[in-house]
Every structure is written in C-alpha cells, then in structure tokens.
Amino acid sequence: MYCNIKWLNRSLIYYGGAMSSMNTNERIVPLLPLRGVLVYPTMVLHLDVGRDKSIQALEQAAMDENIIFLAMQKEMNIDDPKEDDIYSVGTVAKVKQMLKLPNGTLRVLVEGLHRAEVVEFIEEENVVQVSIKTVTEEVEADLEEKALMRTLLEHFEQYIKVSKKVSNETFATVADVEEPGRLADLIASHLPIKTKQKQEILEIISVKERLHTLISIIQDEQELLSLEKKIGQKVKRSMERTQKEYFLREQMKAIQTELGDKEGKGGEVEELREKIEQSGMPEETMKAALKELDRYEKLPASSAESGVIRNYMDWLLALPWTDATEDMIDLAHSEEILNKDHYGLEKVKERVLEYLAVQKLTNSLKGPILCLVGPPGVGKTSLARSIATSLNRNFVRVSLGGVRDESEIRGHRRTYVGAMPGRIIQGMKKAKSVNPVFLLDEIDKMSNDFRGDPSAALLEVLDPEQNHNFSDHYIEEPYDLSKVMFVATANTLSSIPGPLLDRMEIISIAGYTELEKVHIAREHLLPKQLQEHGLRKGNLQVRDEALLEIIRYYTREAGVRTLERQIAKVCRKAAKIIVTAERKRIVVTEKNVVDLLGKHIFRYGQAEKTDQVGMATGLAYTAAGGDTLAIEVSVAPGKGKLILTGKLGDVMKESAQAAFSYIRSRAEELQIDPDFHEKNDIHIHVPEGAVPKDGPSAGITMATALISALTGIPVSKEVGMTGEITLRGRVLPIGGLKEKTLSAHRAGLTKIILPAENEKDLDDIPESVKENLTFVLASHLDEVLEHALVGVKQ
C-alpha cells in the first residue's frame, strides 16, 4: 500500500476541549486495514488500495458520507485480516478523492479526523465493518504541558540539525502548531521509528504522556545518531590510513621499478597477507603467521632465511583449517557401500555404522581411533578406503613400516636445512579437509633408535583428549586433529607398545573360510583380473569347484592375496591360449586346474594319514593367520636328557618342561615307568626347524605327544588341539581361537580340543566351519587324553 503524506495546517475537528464535533456515540463504519502505514488525525495522504474487501469498503463509505475507519494490521503478510490481526485503536477518516487506475486498483485521498476504538468486528461476505466509539484526548492545558511542548520542539530542532533527514520548512510548519496533541502527532509522523512504536503513540490518550514519550524517543534517536557519527568518523580515519598505506606502497613500487630493483616483495606480501586472513586459521596461529610475514617483508629476497620463511608460509596456507566434507549420515547407503566393497568383516562394518548413528544423534562426536589387526591379505587397507567412501570423506594413507625416527611423525625444526613437517601434517595437506579418514598403515612395523621413538610421538596423535592441540616441530603452532577418523592397521599386537595400544580400539580381523574365499574370488578378484588381462566373461569361465581347488592346493593363507595371484596366473594362461590357439572360450574346472597352474603346491587334508605314536597336531597363531603345528616326540635309551629342537622360544621351552614335570608327577596313574626320565633321553621336535616359534598354547599338545610316546598309544590323526598346561594338569585359555580353528578346518581336521574357558570365543567362528568340526572343551589334561589318544575310554 503506497501513500503520499500531507498535513493540514488547520484544526479540522478538535483540540483544546472536546475531541470532535461529530456525534460521539457508537457508529458502524467500513474498515480499511492498512499494511505498514499509520494515519494520525488531521493527516492527509494518498493510499493505493488493491484488495477486494478494501475496495468494497471504500465503495460502502462512498454511500455514507465518505467516512471510513483506518486501522493498521499487526502483520503485513496477511491478505485477509481477521479481528485479532488488526489493532483495536485507529483513526476515523474521510475519503476526499477516489481515482481508479488502469491496473484495477484505487488511489484515494484520505483525511484523518480523530482517534477511535473498535467495539465490535462485523465481517460480511464482501466487506468488513466495525462498530467504533470516539476516543477523547486528555488535555490539561497547564504550564507543564506548555513546558513539555517547548522541550519537544527543542529536541526536534536538534534532531533535524544532526540527522538532516527533515527539511527546515517542515520544522517551520511544526513550530507553528499550538495544540499539544496535534504537535505530538505531527512530530511522531516524521520520526524514523517502527510502525509498532507509532501505533503505541496513537494509543496514548494522555497528551502529557504522549509528549513525554516522544521526548524520550527523540533523545534515543539523538544518541543513535551520535554513535553513528562516531563510527563513521572511525571508518573514515581507517579508510584514510588504508589509502595512505596503499599510496605509499604504490610509490615504493614505482621507485623500485625506476631503480630496476626486481626484488621488491610488496605485491607478494599483500597476497600472502590476504590469504592468511582468509584461511580460517585460529587467532593465535594467524598472529604468528602475520609476524613471520612482517619478518619476510623486511628481509632481502636473496637472504637464505627469506626462503625458509616463504616455505613455512606456503605450508601454513596449504593446510586445511576449516574446510570439511559433510558426512553422509545415511546408514543404509553406507552399509551398501561397505558390503559392496568387502565380503564379511561384520565387526568393522558394525563399528562404522555405530559411529554414523551416534554422529546423527549428536553431530559432535570425536573421530574414533580404530586399529584393524589381522593377517596379510584380509583387506585391512582397502577396508579403510571403503570406510572413507561410505562416510563421504577424503582418504589419506601414511605407511609407517620401517619408520624409526621420531621426526618422521613430528617433523623437523625449521633451524635445520631442508626441514619439513612430519607425516601427519603432510597427510593433512594431502587430505585437504579437517575430517578425513587417515590410515596409519603397518603401525606394528615401526622401530626406534638413537633418533627417538616414533610410537611415542603417535601417543599425542591418537589421544582424543590431546589431538585437538597437536604440535608439529616444523609448524610450531597447534593443529586440531580431533575431527580426523584414524584407522591403523597391524598384523600383530605384540610389537605395539602398551600405551599406544591403549589409545586405540582394537578390531580383530581373522582369516576367511573357504566359502568366503570362493565368494570373494567370484565377486571381486575374478572380475578385476579379467578386466586387467583384457578378457571378457565369455572368454574365461572359472567354476566354483575350480576356485575351491585353487584355494586348497595352491594357497595356504588367511587372506586372499596369493589367491588373487593364482587367479591372475590363470588369466595369463587363458589369454595366451586364446591368442595362440584362437579359442574364444575357456572353461576352468577342477580337472584342468593342474594344466594351468602346474602341480599342487600344498597338501590339503589331514596332516597325517594314519594315527601315529608320539606325534600330535597343535594349532598355532601366526602373523599370517593360523596354522597347524606337528609336534614329534622320540624316546630313546639314555641318561634322562630332555632335548628341545625346532627354534623354540623361551615360553615354549618352559611349556615343554611343565608338561614333562606333570608327566613325572603322575607317571604311575598314566601307566608309565616312574623311572622313565632316568633311563631315557626324550627329544621333542617342532618342524619346520628354521621357523621361530614361541608361546604357551602348545602345552597340552606337547604333553599329549609325550604321553603317547611313553605309553605307545597313538594319537588320533583327526584331532587338533591348543591350550596352555600347568603343573597340576589344568588347561588354561589361549588367544587367536578363530584363526586356529580356520587353520584346522583348512587342514581337514574334524575334532578340536580347546580350553573350556574359551567357550565364549566359539561365537566368533563362522557357522560353515562349525558344521564340519567337533569341539571338545577341556579343563584338565585327563579330558584331553580321553579324546586325543586312540583306544582310551571316554
């Protein structure tokens, strides 16, 4: 609603006594709601009216002395206001002129008459009418009122001089007004205040109170204008200083150009300064960077230190300080990506989905620090990349294998020639975001020497309570790593220091079963190798039984790395046949695998074909997963020597001695000659002799093999066993049960004897493996012997 405001210089209706010469009884008049415009009594202005009900109200007023009630809406965006949407106090006005415009709207000239209050809201079909009653002003006409009028005029005059938004002619018009109420209304209309405040002034009946209110409002406006003026002066001075600096720098450039000095760094410094200010780095870091920049500006370009500082500035600006990728908080989609890239590995996938779920609820969770432990080839590194994809995060990998210098992690101090940041800061630069998935690969392969311990430097990186303030020796300023999701990989935990291990969440990844390997080969390895060797699915078909043949007789691993190499070999052979023999299709079956890969490399099935005396099959946990361990015992006449061979470690030797002592203490019960240790030499050998072996879990296996050799009772070829033995014959729990069980399954064993306390670990073993194995839970060696020795009553 547009308006042109004009004020009458005469008192049309009232002032000085009664408010109006009109009938003060209640009367019904049409309502014209106003949006963002307020009309005071005696005000004349143009209004553009376009709403249907408003046009109908004007037409209704034309039939009844052109009288209409003007009331302001509380909210401007309401097109059809109801009773609660308009203010109850408004102005009765007279329509002086009405003109219809080409666009269908009406332009009307109205003149405010007096204040009125709505008594009843009457809404009809096409028009809204209101029952109103006249509001009479409270005029006292005393000396205080005159003093207030004079004070108001003085403040208004000062306001006009400062603001320069009101003309002197307007002030002259205002100064001629003698009625206090009209004076207050006239000044209120010229003040740049909100319409809500203007409505409040309209609703004030007491003229004195209205004058007081306006004096207070003008004083507030004067203070605001004074503050604006001060701020403007500060801005002006700042701009003048900036312009002066710019002018001087331009002069310096011109002088350098005239002198032929090409080493001036003015433009470069300004560019660096702008980049620093826009980088988003913390305030303290920014101060340090600007301080270094000032040093750089003063140094000659030929100075060696100038190059050091410039390199430092480049590193600071290359780091991500605020840039972050938005996490994909879609559990279903993330799970789909993880399942597509990797088969199995449910624990890791579940942990990632748990992190996403908590992140969705809190949006403030620190990045987890995971450590994936498992044998080579099970997909630890590639899984970390899939985690990054599922989270929609950038991925960066740092290999820690062979790192033995603490400066590799923390960087070198800038005082050294060729100093650089450590691998963590270098990785963050590559990541280009503050929340990447950061892979610390082969964390168990670090070592230490006289230059420091890199694993100790990682303690700060992998501590959620400290890594928000990580300090690199080169950067020398704190860098926030708390939003990074660290994923470490290791083949074994034994070489990782305890404090570092304590900071990580360990997730063990055991080897794959045969069925899992077949699935991985079918869905992932074979399509990849076909593509790399230029073959199509129609050129080479590998049946499942052929894949199983390759897994059993050409690989002996927990992962699938060797399996992939063997499949690649099959593809190469097939490619050669297709090119030379011009055959378009090759089908690999169980029978022709030997033609492509040659003779079997490994023997699948039972370690021994017959039950043997003095030989028992143990289960071992290695860096490559699990494996079977044949333990041989030979008894020969001698002087009671106990010989241990097979490159055994101290713990394994002590297990053999504990088993030997247990058998001596129960020789009669076991039906063994009590003096056997004096008349015989006993030799325990654990092949392969060149491979180091250690650990307590072969205790019951050595005890069983010893008893078998001393009693002449053979050990069942179908049984594998694992467990630590005590001098009392108790069987203690061991670790790595899943890996050991998978190795027993690969070897074709059908029965496994394990400590009773390891029963809880059976849940981790795949059902496809459990179906083919019988588990015997033993708490004492007697139970082991019942199931391991052939012919012993159970």
Curated annotation (Swiss-Prot):
Biological processes, Gene Ontology terms: cellular response to heat; protein quality control for misfolded or incompletely synthesized proteins
Domain Lon N-terminal: 29-222
Protein family membership: Belongs to the peptidase S16 family.
The protein's role, per its UniProt record: ATP-dependent serine protease that mediates the selective degradation of mutant and abnormal proteins as well as certain short-lived regulatory proteins. Required for cellular homeostasis and for survival from DNA damage and developmental changes induced by stress. Degrades polypeptides processively to yield small peptide fragments that are 5 to 10 amino acids long. Binds to DNA in a double-stranded, site-specific manner.
Lon proteolytic domain ranges (all copies): 610-791
Coiled-coil annotated residue ranges, if any: none
Major subcellular site: cytoplasm
Protein EC: 3.4.21.53
Quaternary structure and partners: Homohexamer. Organized in a ring with a central cavity.
Catalytic center residues: 697, 740
Superkingdom, natural source: Bacteria
Keyword Cytoplasm annotated: yes
Designated name of the protein: Lon protease
SMART domains: AAA, LON
InterPro entries named in the record: AAA+_ATPase, ATPase_AAA_core, Lon_bac, Lon_bac/euk-typ, Lon_lid, Lon_proteolytic, Lon_Prtase, Lon_prtase_N
Gene field: lon
Gene Ontology terms for molecular function: ATP binding; ATP hydrolysis activity; ATP-dependent peptidase activity; sequence-specific DNA binding; serine-type endopeptidase activity
Keyword Hydrolase among UniProt keywords: yes
A GO CC term attached to the entry: cytoplasm
Catalytic reaction equation(s): Hydrolysis of proteins in presence of ATP
